[in-house]
Amino acid sequence: MTDAASTPARAAATTGAGTILHDDDAYTDSLIDFVTASPSSYHAATEVARRLDAAGFTRADETVSWEGGLPRRGYVIRDGAIAAWALPEALPAGAGMRIVGAHTDSPALKLKPSAAVVRSGWQLINAEVYGGPLLASFLDRELGLAGRLT
């Protein structure tokens, strides 16, 4: 029987400082820290930006011309979305690209437009299911509010 920690197929990820993690516990801790810091898509975009900054990426401003070119390693944020890229030193003509995508706004319980209601003397917050949550996972924890007021 082999010890999972001694096998070559171990987890590898990066910390906020861009350090490669080859330790399962450090990988797990980094993921837990990310999830804790990201109760909404807005928080997740901010946390990803913080980690990208620590790894040497540059935030690009969408409101100005990029005539001088994009930063080689950069990102843009709009609302609760973030797009990041890493360009090679030299890009051969006809070279392809790889795009990886994910979204952080689902599953969730989202407030309805008329969220505050009173029923039988109880002040309630009217919410709707967004995405496909495993509802049982919401039953054994305190719920909170996170996001942006508009």
Regions found by a protein language model. Name each.
Residues 1-150:
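N-terminal hydrophobic/helix-forming segments and targeting peptides
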